[in-house]
């Protein structure tokens, strides 16, 4: 795959095929020829079967002269023709070949050039035929030639037996290894399950113990609180009510003392001076 060439910008106009002027029937030339008897689609010469289209000129984007590319190719020793020259050059070569009596040769060369251009162009692909090397192919037997050292049948059989025994041993060891691996996995899973269960049981026991301790503490606190409340109530009931500080407190005190003296028999005897 080659490198990309330089980009060339192309700008297309509104009429890239340059057909608007020929299709326009309102032009002076078209109307003048129609008045002279000319009709659309007929020839432009004296005879009716002459050219019906205008002369088409291809754009030449280089400074090379007519046949320069062909001359360059002949100088390189190719001796062929190409279609990359100016328009009409192939037809000119065919005419010259026909005049020189080499029409078939020239036509063949031109066809080959056209085919090569198609193959080597943008969409062309070259394929390499996949064949075997001549040194490794026997044409008579039509088989590949093997250069390996030929071993005896006995050696081959011994080797085959050894390979079979090795494969059997490998299978046994592999099976044993798989079984051991499976047993280890099962033991590991059982151990994990047991550890999980033990942890859960320990946690449950701890939670139960904590709940019991909390309950005992709460009961003790309640008992202490009820005992203190009872003692306070008894103290309050046994204690005398505090004196009321009012304006009649002095009189109530005097009345109380008087009653106390009346209630006491010993005090009454002293008052009335009675001796036993």
Curated annotation (Swiss-Prot):
G-patch domain segment(s): 25-71
Region described as Disordered: 1-23, 152-261
Residues of the signal peptide: none
- Note the InterPro entries from the entry: G_patch_dom, PINX1
This entry carries the following GO cellular component terms, namely:
nucleolus
Where mainly located?
Answer: nucleus
Keywords annotated in UniProt: Nucleus, Ribosome biogenesis, rRNA processing
Which locations, inside or outside the cell, does it occupy? Answer: Nucleus, Nucleolus
Q: Does the keyword rRNA processing apply?
A: yes
What is known about what this protein does? Involved in rRNA-processing at A0, A1 and A2 sites and negatively regulates telomerase.
What is this protein's name?
Protein PXR1
Tell me the organism.
Candida albicans (strain SC5314 / ATCC MYA-2876)
């Amino acid at each position: 795959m080659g490198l990309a060439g330089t980009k060339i910008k192309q700008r297309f106009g509104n009429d890239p095929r340059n057909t608007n002027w020929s299709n326009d029937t309102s032009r002076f030339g078209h109307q003048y020829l129609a008045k002279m008897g000319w009709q659309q689609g007929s020839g432009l010469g004296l005879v009716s079967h002459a050219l019906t289209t205008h002369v088409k000129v291809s754009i030449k984007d280089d400074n090379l002269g007519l046949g320069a590319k062909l001359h360059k190719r002949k100088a390189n020793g190719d001796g062929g023709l190409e279609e990359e020259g100016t328009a009409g050059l192939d037809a000119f070569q065919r005419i010259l070949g026909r005049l020189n009596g080499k029409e078939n040769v020239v036509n063949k060369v031109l066809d080959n050039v056209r085919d090569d251009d198609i193959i080597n162009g943008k969409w062309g692909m070259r394929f390499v035929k996949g064949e075997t090397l001549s040194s490794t192919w026997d044409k008579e037997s039509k088989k590949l030639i093997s250069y390996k050292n030929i071993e005896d049948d006995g050696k081959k059989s011994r080797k085959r037996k050894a390979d079979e025994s090795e494969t059997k041993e490998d299978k046994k060891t592999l099976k044993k290894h798989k079984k051991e691996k499976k047993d280890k996995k099962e033991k590991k899973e059982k151990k994990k399950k047991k550890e999980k269960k033990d942890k859960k049981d320990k946690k449950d026991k701890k939670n139960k113990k904590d709940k019991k301790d909390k309950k005992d503490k709460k009961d003790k606190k309640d008992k202490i609180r009820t005992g203190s409340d009872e003692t306070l109530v008894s103290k309050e009931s046994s204690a005398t009510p505090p004196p009321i500080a009012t304006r009649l407190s002095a009189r109530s005190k005097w009345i109380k003392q008087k009653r106390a003296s009346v209630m006491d028999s010993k005090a009454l005897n002293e008052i009335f001076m009675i001796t036993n």
